[in-house]
């Protein structure tokens, strides 16, 4: 497509995107005035409260349009940048802050080049995708640096508050954004799903506050907390920008935007701080492949000619050694390995999956008993199902077991994958000391053992304490 034609197409799409906001503002003015106004004379529409209420949304759309047009200009075409870092720099759009907190965090990163090297190396797998998604939405590209702060670009990161993944979603917020969390998969760690959810959330917060710094504060602290801080300053006649609200924020949130600013400054000019960024090509690192049938992670890695660790780095959402196939199941592979996977899969003459599920019906079943039943070892079952030592399975639990000849050609159903849970309890000590207590009854003395308290452990997609930041 020629450049002029491309720009014309984008401008036409932008006009369609902006049309609803103009239409809503116009209609609000007409309805509030309760009198017909010719569509050809919109300047005559009075600025009613309803129209004014529409203006933040319209202003946000216009700002997004400005950023999109900037990316189309000859000097800032993102596809012309030599690497992803240059592409990110060209899309910076959040106002800078310059205070002592920023200086402190710049110094922290600048004096830890090893940390920066590890983080940027991990980021090289994912950051092109994040930048591309930001540009599609007309959002500031420095938001692609937020996982530096959240997770150090480690998709396996898991906090003490049960936040997980690149973008550190807690379970409840993850469910709010349709991030599935089951025994087999946690989409909070999935690169595609979590990035889509995080950008949707950030855009929603920006639409709410009309300010990216406040949107970031709300991402960390919660929108309700930011709203209350704004109301408090408004009541005192004080400004409500991020720095004016900082004294009302917890330390983590007060440092959150300055940390992002520090990373932003370093990416903008690493040489100024004696640092070097790795070259990250301005092109996709991975591609997505649909997988409609079950496949073991080890088999998928083998077919793609990848190490298991590298495969898991791109597909960290899978919790078990088997990937449940389905219409929405995708695996990510480096561009050069995707073709190898397709070729090797076509020539593969063996079963793709060696696992199926088994539901516990007995009141309590030992792992050793199950291992014997399915021709494997207790250690294999514990490792496949993340079962700690000295625990047993309770009735209703679903676990992975090796396939038998009867189940070799059967995949695990989506219904089972979505509903499976695992209930564990601590094994009874083999030599539990029986404390005896005397109970007088009918002139006779009886003895009875004191009951043992058996702690229960639930694993899978259960609830956990929500993290304050989300």
Regions found by a protein language model. Name each.
Residues 2-9, 21-138:
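An acidic, Gly/Ser/Thr/Pro-rich helix-cap/linker signature
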Residues 11-19:
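Bacterial N-terminal signal peptides
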Residues 70-125, 136-137, 181-184, 188-208, ...:
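Extracytoplasmic and endomembrane cell-envelope/extracellular-matrix remodeling and assembly machinery
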Residues 100-101, 157-178:
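Short, surface-exposed glycine/acidic/tryptophan-bearing loops
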Residues 140-147, 164, 212-217:
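Alpha-helical scaffolds flanking conserved acidic
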Residues 143, 174-176, 231-234:
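Active-site-adjacent bridging/hinge elements
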């Amino acid at each position: 497509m020629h450049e002029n034609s491309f720009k014309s197409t984008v401008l036409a799409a932008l006009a369609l995107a902006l049309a609803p906001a103009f239409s809503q503002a116009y209609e609000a003015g007409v309805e509030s005035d309760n009198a017909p106004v010719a569509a050809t004379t919109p300047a005559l529409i009075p600025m009613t409260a309803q129209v004014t209420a529409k203006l933040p949304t319209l202003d946000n759309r216009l700002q997004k349009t400005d950023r999109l047009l900037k990316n189309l200009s000859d000097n800032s075409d993102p596809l012309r940048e030599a690497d992803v870092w240059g592409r990110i720099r060209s899309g910076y759009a959040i106002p800078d802050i310059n205070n002592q907190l920023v200086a402190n965090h710049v110094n922290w990163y600048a004096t830890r080049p090893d940390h920066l090297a590890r983080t940027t190396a991990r980021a090289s797998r994912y950051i092109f995708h994040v930048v591309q998604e930001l540009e599609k939405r007309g959002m500031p590209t420095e938001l692609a640096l937020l996982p530096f702060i959240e997770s150090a670009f480690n998709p396996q990161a898991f906090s003490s508050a049960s936040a997980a993944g690149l973008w550190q979603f807690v379970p409840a917020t993850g469910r709010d954004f349709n991030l599935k969390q089951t025994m087999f998969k946690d989409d909070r760690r999935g690169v595609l799903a979590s990035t889509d959810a995080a950008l949707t959330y950030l855009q929603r917060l920006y639409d709410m506050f009309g300010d990216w710094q406040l949107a970031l504060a709300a991402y960390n602290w919660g929108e309700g907390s930011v709203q209350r801080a704004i109301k408090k300053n408004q009541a005192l006649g004080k400004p409500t920008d991020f720095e004016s609200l900082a004294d009302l924020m917890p330390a983590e949130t007060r440092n959150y935007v300055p940390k992002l600013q520090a990373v932003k400054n370093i990416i903008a000019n690493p040489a100024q701080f004696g640092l070097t960024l790795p070259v990250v090509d301005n092109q996709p690192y991975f591609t997505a492949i649909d997988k409609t049938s079950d496949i073991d992670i080890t088999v998928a890695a083998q077919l793609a000619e990848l190490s298991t660790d590298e495969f898991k780095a791109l597909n960290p959402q899978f919790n078990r050694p088997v990937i449940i196939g389905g219409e929405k199941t995708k695996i990510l592979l480096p561009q050069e390995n995707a073709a190898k996977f397709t070729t090797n899969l076509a020539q593969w003459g063996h079963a793709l999956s060696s696992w199926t599920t088994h539901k516990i019906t007995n009141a309590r079943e030992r792992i050793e008993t199950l291992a014997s039943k399915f021709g494997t070892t207790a250690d294999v079952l514990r490792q496949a199902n993340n079962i700690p030592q000295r625990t047993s399975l309770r009735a209703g639990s679903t676990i992975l077991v090796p396939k038998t000849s009867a189940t070799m050609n059967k995949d695990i159903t989506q219904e089972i994958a979505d509903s499976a849970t695992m209930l564990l309890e601590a094994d009874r000590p083999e030599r539990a000391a029986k404390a005896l207590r005397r109970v007088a009854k009918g002139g006779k003395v009886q003895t009875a053992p004191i009951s043992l308290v058996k702690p229960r452990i639930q694993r899978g997609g259960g609830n956990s304490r929500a993290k304050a930041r989300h």
